[in-house]
Amino acid sequence: MRHRSAKLLALLLCILLACSVLGGCAQAEQQKYSTSFFDVFDTVTTIIGYADSQETFDRVVGEARQQFVRYHQVFDGYNAYDGVHNLYYVNQNAASGPVPAEPELMTLLAWIRDLQPSLEGRVNVAMGAVLRLWHDAREAGVALPDEAALREAAGHVDMSQVILDEQAGTVYFADPELSLDLGAVAKGYTAERVAQWMLGSEMPSFIISAGGNVRCGQKPLDGRDRWGISIQDPGPADGLPGTGYMDVLYLTNLS
C-alpha cells in the first residue's frame, strides 16, 4: 500500500513538473494578435488582443465585428437597410406618428434622454436639423450654411420633443421639424457595448480603437500592467520630445 502511494506521489510530482516546464497545463501561452476593418462608422476600427491561438482571436473578433456592423446599421442616419428600423427610418417617419425602432436604438435614446439633466445641453442628439445643413454645405463645397436656415433649424432641437414608448418600442417626434443625429455618441457607445461583451469572452485582454474612441480591456499579457495610448493633436502642436505625441495615457479597463 505504501509502495503504491509512493509511486502515485512520484507520478503526480512528475505531472506538476511537466506542467511547470510547459508554462501550465490549464492555460496555453497567450499571444498578441491584431486586425483592422474599415466598413463601420466611416472610420478604421482596430482590435488588438491576447489569445491562446489565432483561431480564438478570429472567433472573438469575428463576433465583435458583427456587433459593430449591427450598431453601425442601426445608428446610421443617412442610409436605409432592408428590414432595419434604424435612425434613418425614424428620422424619415417619426414626425407623422409613432414608428417602430430597433431595440438597440431605443436603448440608446432612452439612455440619452435620462442623462439630459446632467448633460446641461453639452450633448444634444436632437440637433439633426442643424447638423444636416452643415453636412449639405460640406457636400456642396460651400464654406458656410445659410445663416437664416441655421437660425430656423436651431428652433427645432428640443430633446423633450422626442417621445419614446419603451414598452411599444416606438419613437415619435412631437416637433415635426426635429431630426436626430447620433454622431456625438454612436462610435463611443458602440465601442463600450462591444467591449463589455469582449470582457466576458475568451479574450478579455484587448484594446479597441474606433476612430478616436479607444477602449481598453484587461491588462496586456506581456508583463505590462496597463495599455499605453498615445494622444496626438491633428493640428500643429508641441508634443513629447522625439515622439510627435502630446501625451501618453496608461489605462486598464477604461475608455
Question: Language-model features: where?
Answer:
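Mature catalytic core of soluble alpha/beta enzymes
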Residues: 2-255
